[in-house]
A protein has these predicted regions:
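Cleavable N-terminal export/targeting peptides
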Residues: 1-35
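Short glycine/proline- and aromatic-enriched beta-strand/turn motifs that initiate or cap beta-hairpins
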Residues: 26-89, 236-245
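Predominantly the C-terminal beta-signal and adjacent terminal strand-loop region
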Residues: 32, 106, 192, 197-245
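Residues on the lipid-exposed face of transmembrane beta-strands in outer-membrane beta-barrel proteins
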Residues: 41-43, 85-91, 101, 134-140, ...
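Extracellular/periplasm-exposed beta-strand and loop segments of Gram-negative cell-envelope proteins
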Residues: 48-78, 103-133, 159-187, 215-236
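Repeated loop/turn-to-beta-strand initiation elements of outer-membrane beta-barrel proteins
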Residues: 94-97, 146-148, 202-206
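Helix-adjacent hinge/juxtasegments
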Residues: 125-128, 138-145
Length: 245
């Protein structure tokens, strides 16, 4: 009988401790679930604008349209991976503001399409583009932020870019030389997006997002490029992960 009483007392103490631990844990879960801030990370793929939609005076178009001095590459070669992060703040149940930063960089090898060295070797270059967008967005959540959360949004981006061409080139007199042409700077443009988030437990969400950006870097003729602009626009398809708090 004494043994049973001791077991019962131990069981009661254990139950009370579990209940005491469960109360603040439940309160914390409730607080997190209703939290309106989130830190997010994304991993995706950037599709550069194609030949038919690139801005006039685009340097890539210029490189492809020099007749016998044209370079051989595809615009699609500039498609590549992106990654980034963002901070979201809920303004109410149906609106949230976000600030984020992303990173994209791609190096594309090219050669002269119709010109080679006297010994038959190709005349090669590396074309490299880097884009770092800093964005501010407002998003509309049509069914609220609880459970599965679809959203659409728009905003503005400040785009840091760097474009370079490094390798061997042919000058106006037909001589081959080694050169390096670089242009970097900042430009601004609109961003539109849409996506959906799915809850995982009480504090995490995963989802997908489609984003479009429109911007162009200018002043490339100052650095002796063949075109004065570099089109930075295109679509990004992203996998997203967020931690709510």
């Amino acid at each position: 009988m004494m043994r049973f009483r001791q077991v019962l007392q131990c069981g009661s103490v254990t139950a009370l401790l579990a209940l005491a631990a469960a109360v603040p844990a439940h309160a914390q879960v409730t607080r997190v679930d209703s939290g309106r801030q989130a830190i997010g990370f994304n991993l995706g793929y950037f599709n550069a604008k194609g030949l038919d939609s690139r801005v006039d005076e685009d340097v890539l178009l210029a490189n492809l349209s020099q007749g016998q001095f044209s370079l051989a590459f595809d615009i699609d070669d500039f498609d590549g991976a992106t990654f980034g992060g963002e901070w979201l703040i809920g303004l109410n149940d149906y609106l949230e503001a976000g600030v984020g930063v992303d990173f994209y960089q791609k190096t594309v090898p090219s050669v002269y399409d119709q010109k080679v060295r006297d010994d038959g070797r190709e005349i090669a270059q590396d074309l490299k583009l880097r884009i770092v967008p800093l964005t501010g967005t407002i998003r509309f959540l049509p069914i609220g932020r609880h459970g599965v959360t679809p959203y659409v949004g728009a905003g503005i981006g400040a785009f840091n870019f760097r474009y370079s061409e490094v390798g061997e080139f042919i000058d106006n007199d037909g001589f081959t030389f080694t050169g390096r042409f670089i242009k970097s700077g900042w430009t601004a443009g609109p961003v539109v997006l849409g996506g959906v988030r799915f809850p995982i437990g009480d504090v995490f969400t995963v989802g997908g997002e489609l984003r479009y950006q429109k911007a162009e870097g200018k002043g490339l003729l100052e650095e002796d490029f063949l075109g004065d602009k570099i089109d930075l626009g295109g679509w990004s398809t992203n996998f997203t992960f967020h931690l709510r708090f």
